[in-house]
Amino acid sequence: MACPLQSGFPARTNSRLDVFLRRHLPPEAYDAVRAYEPCIVVSNSENHTLKYVVLSDRLIYLTENPPKSIRRVVALRDVVAIDLIDDYPEFLSSPDGEISQHIRIIYSSTVLKKECKKSKGVRKFLFPFHHTKANNEKVKEEKNGLAFWRIKEPRSLNESPLRDQQESSTPSKNSTLCPRPGVQKLSLHGQGAFRPLPSPSRRSSQSAPATGKAVSEPSCTTNTKEPQGLPDHNNSISEIPFKCSGNGNEFYLGNSLLDSPSQSNSNLEKKESELHLYVISTTSSIFLHLKSSWNNYNIKATLLQDPFYASKFSPAIGSQKPYRSEEKIKHFSQLKSELFLKDNSLRRILPLIMELKVAAQKNFILKRLFWKTSDLFYFLVNKLHEYLPESRDKNALQNQSQRVDELVACIEIIQTLVLMFRETETESSRLNTLAAKKGTLFNLLVILISEPQIPKSCPVFDIQLVADSALVRMSFDAKLQKLILEYTNTATALLYEILLVFQQGNLGLGSRKFAISWMMSFLQSCPPIITFVASIVKQVVRGLSASFQLLTPCQAVLLYQQFYILKSCLQHSRTLAEYIKNNYREEFRYFIHMPALQKRLPLCYPITQHTTQLFHEVLKLVE
């Protein structure tokens, strides 16, 4: 048995591969890389080949081991499921087979309909669409002595010798032919230490390699331009780079060939494909990173469907400058130095925090820089502690206007922290910062579950000012109540992100440092947690009981986060679980049910699938 893993985050530790990615990916795509891992890949285009899987914020790449070329294989927006399969790979030797992790990625792809494949030499045109369940008949076949499951489908031109001749006869100076040897016994050693594997999914432990002939078989030319935008943008052909093959009627679209640029969408059909990754290591966290990146992508893609949110965080059309990491680093350093100036007032700090938030939303590298040193995290938490749950400035206890300014600043700080936590689970510096001073993290938890104190309306003794002051008080009271609601929603989002930190610790990401049981034990010992949980249940009831009104993208993401918090309370805290069951059983019976969710949650949101699954789990725990 190997020694226990020390860092907990072996996401990017191969210097040779890192240099290769830096050279072959655009700067913004390289900065978006989250993790990579050596594995054995099985799909329709890969036959037990030893490669690196490279995960970014939007794409999954494959490259050789050692790296020679890189190609995109799956976009996260097309992913349907990511499962850990509990099986024993027969092609691996005994020691490696026992410690291997089998990861199955099911994704939707789009191909030309069968009647459109008659043109000689035309390959399938692939383009990402959102998933719809395909009712394909699976049949069993034998290949190299192994049992496979595949979609029952006639032989297509994609399998013909003509395709191989086309690929080999169109060399590019950047192209590298991909070897596709069949491997009977493969072995990978030195992959790290032993840890318990995450709970395997039993969705289809029988299925081994890839199914479906709809999987793309692109050439190995290095085509690394990342599709710009998220699902809120139109899925137009212009999103994917194309080049002419020399024939005026043939275009390469990404890595696929289309017989005519005016091909109608009516000739396309969606199918499910599978990508299988076999990781020979018990310490690898690539499965958790894949799940986390997919979830983060769906949250971000849903939020960007909100016009107001997108207008704040999406770059203006026509104003995009070339991406330069050096400029982002310089910008971050400047913001940080201005925030740390002595005698900074709240009015000076607020615009700097807002600028940092917008910059971090647009550039992941700022999130890395934020966690690289711990001082900015401690600074922001200490600022929150100055004003929450009550202000240290005694004047704010009587001054409603001042309290409004303080709450606005606190909301901005918490929103910034939400962004800094999101998508940074692969950063070892984040874990080190949070573990160095757990007292700061627990202080933050208390702040998040506590309702902010607001000043009471002061009596007015001047009779001539009574009418005017009453209107002013009503205005400030309404504004404060609105801010309290916004604060609660923002605190919910940050509590969700912190719960993920502890949950990932349970699953192997720094498990020696964090555990969900510690966090829930601490929370249930804090008196404000009961009021906080009650407010979440009431908000869920209010949101699902509104008649004939669809949830906005931001409301949909908030609902998902609320369900995740409720699930954590029900699973990991006996005290909170009993409180929810004893006090809100009727709400779950009459208001929080599947028909209400289906009426309010649009199917077009990427987060809908995850929310529905989480909703089922919460209902089952309440029963």
UniProtKB/Swiss-Prot annotation:
Composition-biased stretches (Low complexity): 193-210
Compositional bias annotation for Polar residues: 167-177
Pfam families on file: DUF4551
Biased composition (Basic and acidic residues): 157-166
Record region (Disordered): 157-237
The protein's name: Uncharacterized protein C12orf56 homolog
Lineage: Eukaryota, Metazoa, Chordata, Craniata, Vertebrata
InterPro entries per record: DUF4551 (IPR027878)
